[in-house]
Amino acid sequence: MEVGKKLELSITADEVEVLSKAIKNEKFQEMLSNYFQEISSPENVKTYQEEVTLLEQKRGNSIEFIHPSPFRALETSVDGKQRCFINICACDKVGKPESKTVRTVQRFGEKWSLPHLLQPGRQNCERKGNISTIYDVCFHPETLHLADKSEKFMDMVKEVAIQGIQKAFKVLLDKSNLKEMDIKYKGVPQSCVIRKPIPGYEAKEPPEERDLSPSTSHLPENSIDVPSKLLQKQPEEPIKPIYAIKYRSVIDLQDFRVSRESARSLRPKEIVITIDLPLLPTVHGMVLEVEEKRLLLESENPSYRLELHLSYPVDENNGKAKFNKHQRQLTVTLPVQPPLEAPQLPGGSPNPTSDPQNENQTRVEERVEEMAEKGGEQHQRGNDNGAAQGRRQVLEDQNGEKEGKKIQKRNERPEHEVKNETLRKKHDEKFELQDVQQENKGNCSNTKEVKCCRRTKDSLDSLIPTTAASPDGQKKHILTQETEKPKGSVEIPTSSQEYLKVPVTSAATAANVNASDETSKRKPTEEQLEDADEDVLPAEQRFQEPEEINVPAAGTLRQNNAAGNEKINDPHTSAGFVLQNKLMYELD
């Protein structure tokens, strides 16, 4: 197995079952505890090392067991995913540091050689369940003594350890976020082996393919030419953490309907950004800025910087960020802004599908265009007439739809409201007809008054309601002539129980004479009213029935004037008739 490669446990389900049963057995527990005591005993450890040394000599190798002494512990990250710990240890079996003076034309300095021993990384499980990697680097005690006195020399030791681990185990360590820990050693110290081939010795057994000999690494020449530059800590750029961007969408069954509006949008609902920060224990000191299409994360200790340009504009005010302390992972959720609304029409109106008025207008325009296209082969005047006729027809259809909506709304209303509205309309129509009648009566009053001094018997008979005796002896009133809308009525009693109703003014006669003319003049007015509004119904004509009134005796109607002529007076009116011939005008 290669150095630094992770161990994989291959075990079957049957083996797990057997092992679980054995652990529950008391005998197995006792044997296991005895084994731990034997391997941890110093005497048994010494015996084990001697046996391994003899075995390696048969293979032609000389080995030495290294027991590291803790000195410093460093913390960083490996490959930007896991936490990494580097234990700098002391061992007297490692080579001593060496230095050489180097002179150039302008300046001179020293070149150091720091031998060190690298131990393969091992996995360590922390209390919270997180997995970390531990590397051990051993230096000679003199090297660590110089590093303890000078911080600049200590920085050189750290750089040598990081470069050696990256070169030997093909990993990438975070130099900018390297920091010292309060403890001297991370984990449990483990011994390692230095294996060297024996010169001139033929191995009885073939050696292993890989030789775990101690490695010695030197700093580059350009970094150690001058002590001032070698020992000076140069500023480094902040590291860019590992991140992942995910686009999240929501599936809704309404998006799969057979409709124009159910088209599924390719625009995501949210953008989820996951950032790994293995060296950041808390979010204290971290700055996160989110703009419409940009995300910036900065941290000074440890030094992180991440700048992302987003593919979609996001709503920075409604974003969410969550930091997981166990995994040391920051999750940022940003809602994507909805797409812009559809562009407006040239007239400035919004999308026509959202407004019924715009739908009607679009329908009118489409029908007008169809009519214009059909009449394109005809004369230009015919096209104009067809377009106008099509527009008029569409407007009539719209009016019909509006009336239908009104009727539908009226049907949805309660019955008592509909009845009240009908009675109100009839009441208004009645008052309108009365106003028209009053105007006609005013015109009649302005006409010339006709004074009748004498009337013949035939003219009186035409105005007087006559009575005829029925076979049963009952009297019936027969109206011989009636005006359509007279101002007053004239009735002359034919017996002792009937009397004559005479108009108050002499203008009533003119009203009766001109009744037919007024009727003919009034008829066009009613027709105009019917044409103006079909909903207005003509008022019903009601004939006034004669009322039974207590009539005074006939003698009270006859009086003799100073000339000796007999005169008939009406107690209810001021009009009277002068009788020239008593026999001719006797009423009894």
Swiss-Prot record:
UniProt note: phenotype after gene disruption: Organ laterality defects due to altered ciliary motility. Typical randomized left-right mutant leading to situs inversus. Fishes lack directional liquid flow in Kupffer's vesicle (an organ functionally equivalent to the mouse node in terms of left-right specification). Although the number and length of cilia in Kupffer's vesicle seem normal, their motility is completely lost. Homozygous fish are viable but develop primary ciliary dyskinesia. Furthermore, male mutant fish have impaired sperm motility leading to reduced fertility.
Pfam families linked: PIH1, PIH1_CS
Subcellular location as annotated: Cytoplasm; Dynein axonemal particle
Region feature (Disordered): 199-223, 338-498, 510-535
Keyword Cytoplasm: yes
GO terms under biological process: axonemal dynein complex assembly; cilium-dependent cell motility; epithelial cilium movement involved in extracellular fluid movement
GO CC, alphabetical: cytoplasm; dynein axonemal particle; extracellular region
Main location: cytoplasm
Keywords linked to the UniProt accession: Cytoplasm
Cytoplasm among keywords: yes
InterPro entries: Kintoun, PIH1/Kintoun_subfamily, PIH1_N, PIH1D1/2/3_CS-like
Bias kind Polar residues: ranges: 350-361, 435-447
Compositionally biased tracts (Basic and acidic residues): 202-212, 362-382, 393-433, 448-460
Purpose: Required for cytoplasmic pre-assembly of axonemal dyneins, thereby playing a central role in motility in cilia and flagella. Involved in pre-assembly of dynein arm complexes in the cytoplasm before intraflagellar transport loads them for the ciliary compartment.
Sequence similarity: Belongs to the PIH1 family. Kintoun subfamily.
HAMAP family found in the cross-reference section: Kintoun
Stated name of the protein: Protein kintoun
